[in-house]
Amino acid sequence: MFKRITLVGFGLLAGSIAAAVRQKVAIRAVSSKSTLKRAKDLADEFFEYDDVKNWLPGSDLILLCSPIKHIISTIDVLQSNANLLTGEVMVSDIGSTKEEICEKGFALPKPFVFVGGHPMAGSEKHGFEHSDPSIFENAYWLYCLPENLAKLPEPMCELLNFLGSRPVQIAPNDHDFAMAWLSHAPQLLSTSMAAGISPEVVKNHLHLAGRGFRDMTRIAGSSWGMWKDILETNRKNIDEALGIYAQKALEIKSKLDSGLEDDFLLGNETRHSLATGKNYAYPLYEVVANIPDEPGSILKALNPLAAEGINLRDIELMKVREGVGGILLLAFKTENEAESAIKILEDRGIHAVSR
């Protein structure tokens, strides 16, 4: 694995990487002075962005973790300072679009070796204060190789394996096309729901919002600073996807009186084909447990599973009614783990079934 990783930009994902690997790898944090002052527990060395003559030499991996436009400008900085290096240095990034970044990165001169990257992990929260070393566990890490590389270099494979992520190769143009449909346009649809809701509903009835509205508007809380660059660097694909989504919404609106069964069936089929869990690379096996409305009820369900060595991959408290109880959704990697969990919970008087 790499001996020293330089993280340029120190937000949620950079902080999460640092938290996960710091015991095995030396971490250099490159960011603004104000961020560096607050990140003392997550790195070993600290440099401001313009101190490139000190943070560039001696790095095994330079991972660009800032917003997309800053990633692109940092690649220019690396190119201008290649003379500072005496040996090969790998450069990668975590940007949410890939074509513009990879076009720049693949053109870096030796001794740089650039591989485009995009970990399919994150949160509507931002800032390294919310760092989570397990955020990459079982999540895809998409990567783009230049023509002169046949496979992902071994040190990068070791890093991704240590983080628990699942590397998947993809071409930069395929990446941006897919992300427009699966991430970027959905972000705008979520934003349109949250921003376009009736002011009367906001004023008088918003407290009635159920899980459907909350789920669909969750990502509307995302950072504009990050999304501004995404929209600018993937405009063509997003425009196409958003236009077709909008066209379908109008089509559904026009069919309100004539029946929407076929659309519902197609939507059901697409939804059910998704792997369960947060960007997981394989389906998870779900168990639904009924828990009472009393202090410690969640722990009473989870502690026996931990005692038996059964590892949870995902958990969600779905519904709670005061005085009645709630529904706890548990997800497991294997069917055997799910079946064992059901038996353990049932033996302790907690009704549980597979979902």
Which role does the model predict for each range below?
Residues 1-54, 61:
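NAD(P)+-binding Rossmann beta1-loop-alpha1 motif at the extreme N-terminus of oxidoreductases
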Residues 65-67, 95, 145:
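Glycine-rich, N-terminal phosphate-binding loop of Rossmann-like dinucleotide-binding domains
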Residues 135-221:
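Internal alpha-helical scaffold of NAD(P)-dependent oxidoreductase catalytic cores
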Residues 202-268, 287, 294:
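Interdomain hinge/lid region at the active-site interface
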